[in-house]
Amino acid sequence: MKTELIVHKGVHVKKSMLHGWGVFTSSKIKKGDIVEECIIPYDMIPTNTNALINYRFIWPDISFKAAKELGVDVQFSGYCLPLGFGSIYNHSEDPNIDWDIDLSERVVQFTAIKDIKAGEELLFNYESPLVNH
């Protein structure tokens, strides 16, 4: 069981040229590095709520990565709201981070999918089947 969460050195929030607020880095991040781990502290948000609808992630019965590896479909059982910077990252069709959910630890983990320079905004593709933006 995790006893602490990772936030990469230099990761911070500021105004974005893309949309509202965004998550940026003031230090280099290498491909494969964990950018941030966000805790999901409570049970999933019921599917009939309208609260924070634009910031929620779909809560699966199996992680997206595991489903892909096993060749099975992901079933969705509700929504979650990751704490930390999890709901602040902006969208890009050319992302520099990706994410997956560790169901046993109740953590969303964001990972660099390419080398990221200091000063860049950290972006992921909202078109993932697990994001409800």
Residues of each region from the PLM?
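Conserved catalytic SET/PR domain of SAM-dependent protein methyltransferases, capturing the structural core
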Residues: 1-133
